[in-house]
């Protein structure tokens, strides 16, 4: 069996973490890979109900995580829940759809996508390639991936998948542990851009804000140094706006509860709005995708 395992450890997570002197593990959910976009929910349903290899792979990989004391969330249970009409109807109003809706709804810290491809050869033999990729839920950062190719057999896709699953490397799980430790130690990086609406007269470079006769850039610079995780952050001028780079914690240091990027960056937005309130301006969130947040300074509504 040919096994190729490669790992990508970017900024973020996967496995043990020390919180208030206690070990904590992330919740992991193994999900089927489907192409994102329109019709994604239908593709999920088709993969789960019409491809026997998919539920097998999800179950077996989940078992491997359980054997290594990871906390896991069963995707098939979540899938059945979504089939309930009441739940599905409420999910239609959710901002996230497709796989992201499952991951967000289950509150998984990490999700592992599994893609299974079957290739047929002359003579009737076939093999499967199994691709696994682990991602952090909020940012979507790729943390680890593995590619496993089964030997060639005269066998079904389900049987070949079972053979391939025997080749999961221990290094994959070790990498998850180390990456998660690194994430908890260093925090998650977020990039916040702050721009001025075209109908707003605020001069970001020259107008003083707050009570200390400082520019917004200087005020935010001090705030970031005080509030970013371990003081790790900076403010840069970029074009007609500001770029704020800062680290946010994975877990609240006092309660041990997960910290969402939205809640942490919301603190900065409210701080900036407070500085601009007396001038007749407010700061609102224009867009957000993972660790990228766009804020906009606008005229306050009367």
Feature names for model-found ranges:
Residues 1-21:
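Bacterial Sec-dependent N-terminal signal peptides
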């Amino acid at each position: 069996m040919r096994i190729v395992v490669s790992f990508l450890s970017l900024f973020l997570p996967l496995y043990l973490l020390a919180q208030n002197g206690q070990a904590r593990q992330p919740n992991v959910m193994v999900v089927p890979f489907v192409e994102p976009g329109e019709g994604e929910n239908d593709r999920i349903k088709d993969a789960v109900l019409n491809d026997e290899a998919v539920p097998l792979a999800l179950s077996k990989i989940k078992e491997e995580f359980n054997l290594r004391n990871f906390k896991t969330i069963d995707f098939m249970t979540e899938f059945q829940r979504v089939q309930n009409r009441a739940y599905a109807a409420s999910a239609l109003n959710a901002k996230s759809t497709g796989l992201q809706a499952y991951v967000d709804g289950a509150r998984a810290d990490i999700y592992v996508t599994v893609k299974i491809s079957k290739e047929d050869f002359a003579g009737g033999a076939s093999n499967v390639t199994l691709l696994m990729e682990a991602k952090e839920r909020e940012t979507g950062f790729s943390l680890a991936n593995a590619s496993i190719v089964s030997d060639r057999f005269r066998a079904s896709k389900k049987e070949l998948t079972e053979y391939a699953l025997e080749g999961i490397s221990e290094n994959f799980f070790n990498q998850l542990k180390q990456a998660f430790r690194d994430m908890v130690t260093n925090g998650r990086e977020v990039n916040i851009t702050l721009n001025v609406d075209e109908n707003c007269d605020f001069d970001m470079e020259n107008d003083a804000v707050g009570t200390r006769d400082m520019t917004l850039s200087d005020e935010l610079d001090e705030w970031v140094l005080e509030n970013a995780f371990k003081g790790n952050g900076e403010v840069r001028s970029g074009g007609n706006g500001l770029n704020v780079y800062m680290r946010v914690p994975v877990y609240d240091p006092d309660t041990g509860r997960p910290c969402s990027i939205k809640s942490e960056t919301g603190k900065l937005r409210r701080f900036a709005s407070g500085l601009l309130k007396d001038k007749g301006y407010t700061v609102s969130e224009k867009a957000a995708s993972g660790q990228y947040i766009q804020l906009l300074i606008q005229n306050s509504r009367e």
